[in-house]
Swiss-Prot record:
NCBIfam families: PRK05022.1
Binding site for ATP: 215-222, 278-287
The protein's annotated pathway: Nitrogen metabolism; nitric oxide reduction
Organism phylogeny: Bacteria, Pseudomonadati, Pseudomonadota, Gammaproteobacteria, Enterobacterales
List of residues that carry 4-aspartylphosphate: D57
Pfam families on file: GAF, Sigma54_activat
CDD domains noted in UniProt: AAA (cd00009)
Organism: Salmonella typhimurium (strain LT2 / SGSC1412 / ATCC 700720)
SMART domains: AAA (SM00382), GAF (SM00065)
Keyword terms of this UniProt record: ATP-binding, DNA-binding, Nucleotide-binding, Phosphoprotein, Transcription, Transcription regulation
Residues covered by the Sigma-54 factor interaction domain: 187-416
Name of the protein: Anaerobic nitric oxide reductase transcription regulator NorR
Length: 506
């Protein structure tokens, strides 16, 4: 059997029919699997000494979430070094990266494997891998025929990555036009919710707008901030991180703006704050809702005027910093409650983004599980870590109240448990290895953290919120007005007056 002109033309036509890069990639490997009659095919992108799956056919879905390092996968390292078609003999001692990852064949190892490195000029940009359970499956195809397939795939991948680069740079003046792969941000997911989020990140990354990133705890807001920074013109400069929730009030101002020698006890030398460290770069303020009102006012001034004052210094320093902020709170409610400044909220939320909870991301759970399985494999020195079909179903049926962070911990714990009950360096995760509560059902869809209030205006919304706060305080304190005032941190006389104005008492 050999490739005819019609077969090659058919592959080229399928590439042109695709709508978008992902569809073209999928059409390519699906067609190749049919033409070569193999059990599995995959298109991989090469970056930073690792291969990242872009499209698969005949492999377990979690492969799309895995990241295959050269150090951890000798066959892929051989493909990366070869520069030409690589055929692995059926008795090769090198483990196949897809062993145990062909559905229905989890306990069997791949027998035949061909690797095709993909190049753009002299740069390695990816690889095609072809696997079969029959040892002699690929012997009927010549190296020259496989090189033609590699050329078609390399052209499709090179064009896609170049377009991605140009889009991420927004055709910025000064762009060299030389092909440079986009950096991996570990934002794994193909669900509609994640696809939309990635599009919004691409839109805002090339601008210089401040961004407010909302979402539940554990959804990956820091990864969103990294993706925005990496896709921006500021990517050559630092991304500085500060967790506002971990800042004691006594040192918060110094952490943000720095201090001069002698500004306070213990200030034995001048010290730059996070804003100075992030000059010409990006500052990511995590848990922004935890900042005190006093610090919020000082942060607002920096956003308005672009200058800071170190603690203990009267001089102003100019800084050029893009601010990305994240919160798991509903800042609109915080504004109504008087705990967050409305003017700062509007300064930060020029372009709001919402990171969806894991329960709304469908099959992304399996992709992320694959990513964490591969991490565990490398960390523990195992030859393979795979999910059984039952384990995949179990993960998909769980509600994940702790989101991606909970999934990561669950995978790590399951690998340790499975390893303890099985000899050797191969781990197959079963449903029983996951200590997940059966009674935790998927939570209802979360409303956007920027959902508009149903009231007609700000005053009505504020009064309704105050009314509810007072009712709750009274209920929790047996309708004792003095105790309720203490709980609300207000004077009892002021509470009586406010309640009367709101119609809660005569």
């Amino acid at each position: 059997m050999s490739f005819s002109v019609e077969v090659l033309a058919g592959i080229a036509i399928e590439l042109q029919r695709g709508i978008g890069h992902q569809d073209r990639f999928q059409r390519l490997i699906t067609t190749l699997r049919q033409v070569l009659a193999c059990d599995a095919s995959a298109l991989l992108r090469y970056e930073s000494r690792q291969f990242i799956p872009l499209a698969i056919d005949g492999l377990a879905q979690d492969v799309l979430g895995r990241r295959f390092t050269l150090e951890g996968h000798p066959r892929l390292e051989a493909i990366a070094r070869a520069g030409d078609v690589v055929r692995f003999p059926a008795d090769s001692d090198l483990p196949d990266p897809y062993d145990g990852l062909i559905p229905g064949q989890e306990s069997l190892k791949v027998h035949a494997c061909v690797g095709l490195p993909l190049f753009a000029g002299q740069n390695l940009i990816g690889a095609l891998t072809l696997d079969a359970m029959t040892p002699e499956q690929f012997e009927v195809f010549s190296d020259e025929e496989l090189r033609l397939v590699a050329a078609l795939a390399a052209g499709a991948l090179s064009n896609a990555l170049l377009i991605e680069q140009l889009e991420s740079q927004n055709m910025l003046p000064g762009s060299s036009g030389v092909f440079e792969p986009i950096k991996e941000t570990h934002m794994i997911g193909l669900s509609p919710a994640m696809t939309q989020l990635k599009k919004e990140i691409e839109i805002v990354a090339g601008s210089d707008l401040n961004v407010l990133i909302g979402g539940e705890t554990g959804t990956g807001k820091e990864l969103v901030a990294k993706a925005i920074h990496q896709g921006s013109p500021r990517a050559v400069n630092p991304l500085v991180y500060l967790n506002c929730a971990a800042l004691p009030e006594s040192v918060a101002e110094s952490e943000l703006f720095g201090h001069v020698k002698g500004a306070f006890t213990g200030a034995i030398s001048n010290r730059s704050g996070k804003f100075e460290m992030a000059d010409n770069g990006t500052l990511f303020l995590d848990e922004i809702g935890e900042l005190s009102l006093a610090l919020q006012a000082k942060l607002l001034r920096v956003l308005q005027y672009g200058d800071i004052q170190r603690v203990g210094d009267d001089r102003s320093l100019r800084v050029d910093v893009r601010v990305l902020a994240a919160t798991n709170r509903d800042l609109r409610e915080e504004v109504l409650a008087g705990r967050f400044r409305a003017d700062l909220f509007h300064r930060l939320s020029v372009f709001p983004l919402f990171v969806p909870p894991l329960r709304e991301r469908g099959d992304d759970v399996v992709l992320l599980a694959g990513y964490f399985c591969e991490q565990c494999r490398l960390r523990l020195g195992l030859s393979r870590v795979v999910l059984s079909p039952g384990a995949r179903r179990h993960l998909l049926n769980y509600g994940w109240p702790g989101n991606v962070r909970e999934l990561e911990h669950a995978i790590h714990r399951a690998v340790v448990l499975a390893r303890a009950t099985r000899a050797g360096d191969e781990v197959i995760l079963e449903a029983q290895h996951f200590a997940l509560s059966e009674d935790v059902l998927p939570a209802p869809p979360a409303e956007s953290f920027l959902a508009l209030p149903t009231c007609r205006n700000l005053r009505e919304s504020t009064e309704n919120f105050q009314r509810e706060m007072i009712r709750q305080a009274l209920a929790q304190n047996n309708h004792n007005w003095a105790a309720s005032a203490r709980a609300l941190e207000t004077d009892v006389a002021n509470l009586h007056r406010l309640a009367k104005r709101l119609g809660l008492k005569d």
